[in-house]
Amino acid sequence: MSGAITCSAADLATLLGPNATAAADYICGQLGTVNNKFTDAAFAIDNTYLLFSAYLVFAMQLGFAMLCAGSVRAKNTMNIMLTNVLDAAAGGLFYYLFGYAFAFGGSSEGFIGRHNFALRDFPTPTADYSFFLYQWAFAIAAAGITSGSIAERTQFVAYLIYSSFLTGFVYPVVSHWFWSPDGWASPFRSADDRLFSTGAIDFAGSGVVHMVGGIAGLWGALIEGPRRGRFEKGGRAIALRGHSASLVVLGTFLLWFGWYGFNPGSFTKILVPYNSGSNYGQWSGIGRTAVNTTLSGCTAALTTLFGKRLLSGHWNVTDVCNGLLGGFAAITAGCSVVEPWAAIVCGFMASVVLIGCNKLAELVQYDDPLEAAQLHGGCGAWGLIFVGLFAKEKYLNEVYGATPGRPYGLFMGGGGKLLGAQLVQILVIVGWVSATMGTLFFILKRLNLLRISEQHEMQGMDMTRHGGFAYIYHDNDDESHRVDPGSPFPRSATPPRV
């Protein structure tokens, strides 16, 4: 704990006279005991804060489940819900066995960790069980992102394989590069050993979590191909509407709530005073991070609302929800190191990026039921670039440790080195995830383990794979959920049963 009490006989000699040594030993011993109590209390408070943040991040799994369920057709609800449960369950086991060691095991050459497999020799002087739990919650978030991209057409065994591989190997390697003190691009390395003298700044994971999940989903959806009926023979897009906007909104609010553990919780400690003043410390940085997260998401939501209104002619709640989440995904990298006004810029541009990526996806006939690759991959990449433009020198030194001459945001007068490091991060994440997850999805396809049959896809996986529908009554998915691109109304005039 900073500001520890110090005491010695020499300090007290002028006050205690002839008996200075004996009295000083006693007094210093008592003060040492008090100091240890304060240190223990600070450690307990920091761990409690981290555990609370881990619980919030884990609650995002419920948000992902609701968002996914509402975004697919009713006939595939049980399937997508089960995959979300297994993302957490399989991810928990594989992150325990391998993932944490690869990510934070230490003693590496900058590429991958080599210790603490199955939490052996754990806890360590630098990490307790609360840190493992927090990082596991992050790992399964990446897997949850990917599941949305390949929804409604993927074999169940493929989910198990890709989720285990992603959380046990692919994601941990990336998190080691940028978050471990040993990582080759980490900002926590010694000053003279950092990438471009700064390291890549990805505070809570626009790249490490969102881009990894989004790029993995991109390859899965590309290799599988679009859902049946998503595009007509002439290339005209047909929107396959999700069956419940209510679940989408519920999932969005749960994710919003969890993001206050995702971003502010990434400080991992709260009782860290800064040198700027006794009443100013990490608790202030945590508050600023929460405010920046809020402003970016809100700005992206409103920008998407009016942008989509101009493009489609109607107000669409699911588009607004995706815009909100895109703003959150983008600010995640720089939430701790930018001013609140910059977070508004981040959210505005995140909405523009998301809308643009969705237009491009339609042009190339790319089908992603939850827009996960566009939202998490595209907005995550923008978030990394945003840091290179708007990161503030003062906040970088507070969050990552004071370093004379540390590069900071280009638009803030800090030169282009940080932006260069951010671009390198984007490139290596795209390359690594493409090489690993793209190869895995290709192998699964060649082994006929990736996509379900056309008959099962048309009938719905709930009936053909999971023993029955999620609801006693459900809509006729093939008709009522097919929507002309320019209309908010389904083709079928038959009202849905409830």
UniProtKB/Swiss-Prot annotation:
Main location (coarse class): membrane
Any one cellular-component term (Gene Ontology): ammonium transmembrane transporter complex
Modification Phosphothreonine occurs at: 464
Location(s), subcellular: Cell membrane
Membrane topology: Multi-pass membrane protein
Membrane among keywords: yes
Region of interest: Disordered: 479-498
Induction and repression of expression: By nitrogen deprivation. Highest expression at the end of the light period.
Keyword Ligase: no
Tissue: Highly expressed in roots. Expressed in root tips, root hairs, root epidermis, rhizodermis and cortex.
One BP annotation, GO: ammonium transmembrane transport
Chain positions found as Phosphoserine: 487
Pfam families linked: Ammonium_transp (PF00909)
Residues annotated as transmembrane: 50-70, 85-105, 131-151, 156-176, 203-223, 247-267, 315-335, 337-357, 370-390, 423-443
Molecular functions (GO terms): ammonium channel activity
Key words, A-Z: Ammonia transport, Cell membrane, Membrane, Phosphoprotein, Transmembrane, Transmembrane helix, Transport
Domain of life: Eukaryota
Family under the similarity heading: Belongs to the ammonia transporter channel (TC 1.A.11.2) family.
The protein's role, per its UniProt record: Ammonium transporter probably involved in ammonium uptake from the soil. Contributes with AMT1-1 to the overall ammonium uptake capacity in roots under nitrogen-deficiency conditions.
Name of the protein in its database record: Ammonium transporter 1 member 3
